[in-house]
From Swiss-Prot:
Residues 1-60 form a transit peptide. It comes from Arabidopsis thaliana. It is found in: Plastid, Chloroplast. Belongs to the class-IV pyridoxal-phosphate-dependent aminotransferase family. The modification N6-(pyridoxal phosphate)lysine is found at residue 259. Branched-chain amino acids are synthesized in chloroplasts, whereas the degradation takes place in mitochondria. The lineage of its organism: Eukaryota, Viridiplantae, Streptophyta, Embryophyta, Tracheophyta. This is Branched-chain-amino-acid aminotransferase 3, chloroplastic.
Amino acid sequence: MERAAILPSVNQNYLLCPSRAFSTRLHSSTRNLSPPSFASIKLQHSSSSVSSNGGISLTRCNAVSSNSSSTLVTELADIDWDTVGFGLKPADYMYVMKCNIDGEFSKGELQRFGNIEISPSAGVLNYGQGLFEGLKAYRKKDGNNILLFRPEENAKRMRNGAERMCMPAPTVEQFVEAVTETVLANKRWVPPPGKGSLYVRPLLMGTGAVLGLAPAPEYTFIIYVSPVGNYFKEGVAPINLIVENEFHRATPGGTGGVKTIGNYAAVLKAQSIAKAKGYSDVLYLDCIYKRYLEEVSSCNIFIVKDNVISTPEIKGTILPGITRKSMIDVARTQGFQVEERNVTVDELLEADEVFCTGTAVVVSPVGSVTYKGKRVSYGEGTFGTVSKQLYTVLTSLQMGLIEDNMKWTVNLS
């Protein structure tokens, strides 16, 4: 089987190491900026269709401003872009939109980033009625244009999760417009090319007061952003995982397949134990047979054997990752055979390569896996051949380094 080679036009060092091509720091004259006007911002898309859940399925869209006098934030925030890790660095603005029990969302607005007021009896605080999403914005190599990666997929996933959690959710169009406004309002926080990305965090919460167990009478949709670098402290170096035997992330019929807030608090115990032992994160097994791979705490898992790529199938206990979905499509366009199926822990231990995917990690090679005291290593302290090829193509698409034939990116110009 012939596979497409790594794109020769892409400098892989640009993807694997911070770029020095955009090193000039532009200093902000003031942080107390007035919100830019977004009344004229429209979403243009080549085609759309109304989905069964009432949202609009966008195949491609571009954000443009029809008012040339609108003032957008163009300078970069005055921070050390070379040391940006994956921690919160509050930007200027957040987006807030309310919804009452009838399911209709009011017009959202940009507010200065800050604390919110919430009732002690809010549904999200008492019963965990909340969802979140995560996506990224990248500054293109020219330093001007900004790209969003598949925001409509996050919108659809939030709507699916909201249905499971008995919550109303913004339409796909409302979601994408809100993300667009928020990113443009915080444009100066989008890192220079090669220095990281702007992490976008949409939240949907039951903020109405309840006492008995019931859906909240009011909901709040919030988006905030933060510039980020690599998720794992290892950066793009391989991570070390431990397979968890005692704790489980999800059960059949539960909420493992949606991005509800409770799924993540539940993994903190096992993750803390693993990190105390020197591991990067935890790989979970299914809770019934305890032999099939599920996922890592915050990302999906892939194995490679004889150039065949395998990943656990989506069946309700694994989050349908957008990076996972994108990686599968990229791999197939590169000529690889990809299987979505039950993957055993024994296959993991015999794999040629192992890697993780997720919005936060993008693609992270796995250097070792420890299972019942047995440690198996992969590669030689760097990306494997297959994972490096896929990483190069995917990140090149995300950063606008190659033509987006997949129609995945949204150009904010």
